[in-house]
Amino acid sequence: MTVLAPAWSPNSSLLLLLLLLSPCLRGTPDCYFSHSPISSNFKVKFRELTDHLLKDYPVTVAVNLQDEKHCKALWSLFLAQRWIEQLKTVAGSKMQTLLEDVNTEIHFVTSCTFQPLPECLRFVQTNISHLLKDTCTQLLALKPCIGKACQNFSRCLEVQCQPDSSTLLPPRSPIALEATELPEPRPRQLLLLLLLLLPLTLVLLAAAWGLRWQRARRRGELHPGVPLPSHP
Protein backbone atom coordinates (compact mmCIF):
# COMPACT_ATOMS: atom_id res chain seq x y z
CA MET A 1 0.00 0.00 0.00
CA THR A 2 1.37 3.36 -0.98
CA VAL A 3 0.87 6.32 1.35
CA LEU A 4 0.76 9.64 -0.40
CA ALA A 5 2.35 12.53 1.46
CA PRO A 6 0.36 15.79 1.48
CA ALA A 7 1.58 18.30 -0.98
CA TRP A 8 3.42 21.22 0.63
CA SER A 9 4.72 24.19 -1.20
CA PRO A 10 6.13 27.65 -0.38
CA ASN A 11 2.78 29.09 -1.39
CA SER A 12 1.12 27.13 1.42
CA SER A 13 3.54 28.57 3.98
CA LEU A 14 2.89 32.07 2.70
CA LEU A 15 -0.87 31.55 2.94
CA LEU A 16 -0.58 30.32 6.54
CA LEU A 17 1.54 33.33 7.48
CA LEU A 18 -1.00 35.72 5.98
CA LEU A 19 -3.80 34.04 7.91
CA LEU A 20 -1.89 34.41 11.18
CA LEU A 21 -1.19 38.06 10.53
CA SER A 22 -4.68 38.90 9.37
CA PRO A 23 -6.23 41.54 11.70
CA CYS A 24 -9.65 39.93 11.25
CA LEU A 25 -8.42 36.68 12.76
CA ARG A 26 -6.30 38.27 15.46
CA GLY A 27 -9.29 40.14 16.90
CA THR A 28 -9.51 43.66 18.24
CA PRO A 29 -6.87 45.08 20.59
CA ASP A 30 -7.39 44.86 24.33
CA CYS A 31 -9.38 47.76 25.77
CA TYR A 32 -10.79 48.92 22.43
CA PHE A 33 -14.17 50.65 22.13
CA SER A 34 -15.65 51.21 18.69
CA HIS A 35 -18.67 52.97 20.20
CA SER A 36 -19.37 54.78 23.46
CA PRO A 37 -20.32 52.35 26.26
CA ILE A 38 -21.59 55.20 28.47
CA SER A 39 -25.33 55.81 28.40
CA SER A 40 -26.88 59.25 28.20
CA ASN A 41 -28.71 58.96 31.56
CA PHE A 42 -25.97 57.49 33.71
CA LYS A 43 -26.17 60.44 36.13
CA VAL A 44 -29.76 59.48 37.00
CA LYS A 45 -28.65 56.01 38.11
CA PHE A 46 -25.90 57.42 40.29
CA ARG A 47 -28.32 59.90 41.84
CA GLU A 48 -30.87 57.19 42.65
CA LEU A 49 -28.24 55.06 44.36
CA THR A 50 -26.95 58.02 46.38
CA ASP A 51 -30.48 58.96 47.49
CA HIS A 52 -31.21 55.42 48.74
CA LEU A 53 -28.01 55.01 50.73
CA LEU A 54 -29.05 54.35 54.34
CA LYS A 55 -25.42 54.31 55.44
CA ASP A 56 -22.34 55.95 53.99
CA TYR A 57 -20.28 52.77 53.69
CA PRO A 58 -16.51 53.15 54.06
CA VAL A 59 -14.51 52.41 50.92
CA THR A 60 -11.01 53.21 49.69
CA VAL A 61 -9.82 55.28 46.74
CA ALA A 62 -6.40 55.59 45.14
CA VAL A 63 -4.80 58.98 45.71
CA ASN A 64 -1.64 58.75 43.60
CA LEU A 65 -2.77 57.63 40.16
CA GLN A 66 -0.56 58.99 37.41
CA ASP A 67 -2.25 61.95 35.71
CA GLU A 68 -2.23 60.29 32.29
CA LYS A 69 -4.70 61.67 29.75
CA HIS A 70 -7.84 59.47 29.62
CA CYS A 71 -5.99 56.63 31.38
CA LYS A 72 -6.48 58.08 34.86
CA ALA A 73 -10.25 58.22 34.37
CA LEU A 74 -10.26 54.62 33.13
CA TRP A 75 -8.16 53.47 36.09
CA SER A 76 -10.49 55.20 38.54
CA LEU A 77 -13.51 53.48 36.96
CA PHE A 78 -11.71 50.14 37.10
CA LEU A 79 -11.08 50.51 40.85
CA ALA A 80 -14.61 51.80 41.49
CA GLN A 81 -16.17 48.85 39.65
CA ARG A 82 -14.36 46.44 41.98
CA TRP A 83 -15.96 48.19 44.97
CA ILE A 84 -19.43 48.11 43.41
CA GLU A 85 -19.12 44.36 42.89
CA GLN A 86 -18.02 43.91 46.49
CA LEU A 87 -20.88 46.01 47.88
CA LYS A 88 -23.41 43.96 45.91
CA THR A 89 -22.49 40.90 47.97
CA VAL A 90 -23.53 42.55 51.27
CA ALA A 91 -26.41 44.79 50.13
CA GLY A 92 -30.14 44.09 50.39
CA SER A 93 -32.31 43.27 47.39
CA LYS A 94 -33.35 46.87 46.69
CA MET A 95 -29.81 48.18 47.07
CA GLN A 96 -28.46 45.37 44.92
CA THR A 97 -30.70 46.50 42.07
CA LEU A 98 -29.48 50.09 42.34
CA LEU A 99 -25.87 48.95 42.59
CA GLU A 100 -26.31 46.80 39.49
CA ASP A 101 -27.75 49.77 37.58
CA VAL A 102 -24.62 51.74 38.40
CA ASN A 103 -22.44 48.74 37.68
CA THR A 104 -23.81 48.46 34.14
CA GLU A 105 -22.52 51.98 33.45
CA ILE A 106 -18.92 51.12 34.36
CA HIS A 107 -18.88 47.39 33.60
CA PHE A 108 -17.23 48.10 30.25
CA VAL A 109 -13.87 48.43 32.03
CA THR A 110 -13.91 44.66 32.66
CA SER A 111 -13.30 44.13 28.93
CA CYS A 112 -9.82 45.58 29.47
CA THR A 113 -7.21 43.09 30.63
CA PHE A 114 -5.53 45.27 33.22
CA GLN A 115 -2.24 44.17 34.70
CA PRO A 116 -2.02 43.50 38.47
CA LEU A 117 -2.13 46.67 40.54
CA PRO A 118 1.31 48.10 41.31
CA GLU A 119 2.62 48.09 44.87
CA CYS A 120 3.23 51.83 44.73
CA LEU A 121 -0.52 52.55 44.66
CA ARG A 122 -1.70 54.29 47.85
CA PHE A 123 -5.27 54.12 49.11
CA VAL A 124 -7.12 56.28 51.63
CA GLN A 125 -10.45 55.58 53.27
CA THR A 126 -13.46 57.57 52.21
CA ASN A 127 -17.24 57.06 51.94
CA ILE A 128 -19.27 55.45 49.17
CA SER A 129 -20.98 58.77 48.41
CA HIS A 130 -17.60 60.32 47.63
CA LEU A 131 -16.68 57.33 45.46
CA LEU A 132 -19.94 57.61 43.50
CA LYS A 133 -19.41 61.32 42.96
CA ASP A 134 -15.86 60.77 41.71
CA THR A 135 -16.97 57.91 39.46
CA CYS A 136 -19.64 60.11 37.92
CA THR A 137 -17.00 62.78 37.30
CA GLN A 138 -14.72 60.29 35.53
CA LEU A 139 -17.58 59.14 33.29
CA LEU A 140 -18.27 62.75 32.36
CA ALA A 141 -14.61 63.18 31.44
CA LEU A 142 -14.58 60.08 29.21
CA LYS A 143 -17.99 60.39 27.56
CA PRO A 144 -17.08 63.02 24.89
CA CYS A 145 -14.09 60.97 23.76
CA ILE A 146 -14.52 57.23 24.28
CA GLY A 147 -15.69 55.38 21.19
CA LYS A 148 -15.14 58.49 19.08
CA ALA A 149 -11.85 60.38 19.04
CA CYS A 150 -10.25 57.84 21.37
CA GLN A 151 -11.05 54.16 20.87
CA ASN A 152 -7.91 52.22 21.67
CA PHE A 153 -6.99 52.31 25.37
CA SER A 154 -4.44 49.49 25.25
CA ARG A 155 -1.75 51.85 26.53
CA CYS A 156 -3.76 52.19 29.76
CA LEU A 157 -3.63 48.51 30.73
CA GLU A 158 -0.81 49.13 33.20
CA VAL A 159 -2.02 51.18 36.15
CA GLN A 160 0.66 53.74 36.97
CA CYS A 161 1.45 55.73 40.10
CA GLN A 162 2.71 59.25 40.46
CA PRO A 163 6.43 59.52 41.32
CA ASP A 164 7.12 59.36 45.03
CA SER A 165 7.20 62.93 46.34
CA SER A 166 9.98 62.01 48.78
CA THR A 167 12.36 61.45 45.87
CA LEU A 168 11.53 64.66 44.06
CA LEU A 169 12.53 68.18 44.96
CA PRO A 170 9.55 70.53 45.09
CA PRO A 171 9.55 73.27 42.47
CA ARG A 172 10.78 76.56 43.86
CA SER A 173 10.51 79.99 42.35
CA PRO A 174 13.51 82.35 42.09
CA ILE A 175 11.84 84.62 44.65
CA ALA A 176 11.57 81.76 47.09
CA LEU A 177 15.21 80.90 46.53
CA GLU A 178 16.26 84.46 47.29
CA ALA A 179 14.13 84.53 50.42
CA THR A 180 15.18 81.20 51.89
CA GLU A 181 18.68 80.35 50.73
CA LEU A 182 21.29 82.29 52.66
CA PRO A 183 24.99 81.77 51.97
CA GLU A 184 26.79 79.82 54.63
CA PRO A 185 29.58 81.70 56.46
CA ARG A 186 33.05 80.75 55.28
CA PRO A 187 36.42 81.19 57.03
CA ARG A 188 37.47 83.81 54.48
CA GLN A 189 34.36 85.85 55.14
CA LEU A 190 34.93 85.61 58.90
CA LEU A 191 38.51 86.84 58.47
CA LEU A 192 37.32 89.80 56.41
CA LEU A 193 34.78 90.62 59.10
CA LEU A 194 37.50 90.59 61.77
CA LEU A 195 39.71 92.88 59.69
CA LEU A 196 36.86 95.36 59.37
CA LEU A 197 36.20 95.29 63.10
CA LEU A 198 39.87 95.71 64.08
CA PRO A 199 40.17 99.46 63.28
CA LEU A 200 36.96 100.16 65.13
CA THR A 201 38.29 98.27 68.13
CA LEU A 202 41.55 100.26 68.09
CA VAL A 203 39.64 103.55 67.89
CA LEU A 204 37.52 102.57 70.87
CA LEU A 205 40.60 101.54 72.87
CA ALA A 206 42.36 104.80 72.03
CA ALA A 207 39.31 106.83 73.04
CA ALA A 208 39.05 104.93 76.32
CA TRP A 209 42.76 105.45 77.05
CA GLY A 210 42.56 109.17 76.24
CA LEU A 211 39.56 109.60 78.52
CA ARG A 212 41.38 107.79 81.31
CA TRP A 213 44.49 109.94 80.82
CA GLN A 214 42.48 113.17 80.94
CA ARG A 215 40.81 112.10 84.17
CA ALA A 216 44.16 111.23 85.72
CA ARG A 217 45.60 114.57 84.66
CA ARG A 218 42.75 116.42 86.29
CA ARG A 219 43.31 114.49 89.50
CA GLY A 220 47.01 115.44 89.32
CA GLU A 221 46.13 119.09 89.05
CA LEU A 222 43.87 118.82 92.09
CA HIS A 223 46.43 116.77 94.07
CA PRO A 224 50.00 117.93 93.28
CA GLY A 225 52.71 115.34 93.79
CA VAL A 226 50.70 112.46 92.29
CA PRO A 227 52.56 111.17 89.19
CA LEU A 228 50.57 111.12 85.97
CA PRO A 229 50.43 107.91 83.90
CA SER A 230 52.85 107.96 81.03
CA HIS A 231 51.30 108.50 77.57
CA PRO A 232 52.27 105.91 74.97
UniProtKB/Swiss-Prot annotation:
Q: Which UniProt keywords apply?
A: Cell membrane, Cytokine, Disulfide bond, Glycoprotein, Membrane, Secreted, Signal, Transmembrane, Transmembrane helix
Q: How does it sit in the membrane?
A: Single-pass type I membrane protein
Give the sugar-modified residues: 127, 152
Q: InterPro entries per the record?
A: 4_helix_cytokine-like_core, Flt3_lig
- The chain's disulfide connectivity reads 31-112, 71-156, 120-161
Q: Which residues lie on this side of the membrane: Extracellular?
A: 27-189
GO MF terms on file?
cytokine activity; identical protein binding; receptor tyrosine kinase binding
Give the primary localization class: membrane
A Pfam family reported for this protein in Swiss-Prot or TrEMBL: Flt3_lig
A cellular component term, taken from the record's GO annotations: extracellular space
Is Nuclease set as a keyword in this record? no
- Subunit structure of this entry? Homodimer (soluble isoform).
Summary of the function given for this chain in its UniProt record: Stimulates the proliferation of early hematopoietic cells by activating FLT3. Synergizes well with a number of other colony stimulating factors and interleukins. Essential for the development of natural killer (NK) cells, B cells, and dendritic cells (DCs).
Q: What is this protein called?
A: Fms-related tyrosine kinase 3 ligand
Organism of origin is Mus musculus (Mouse)
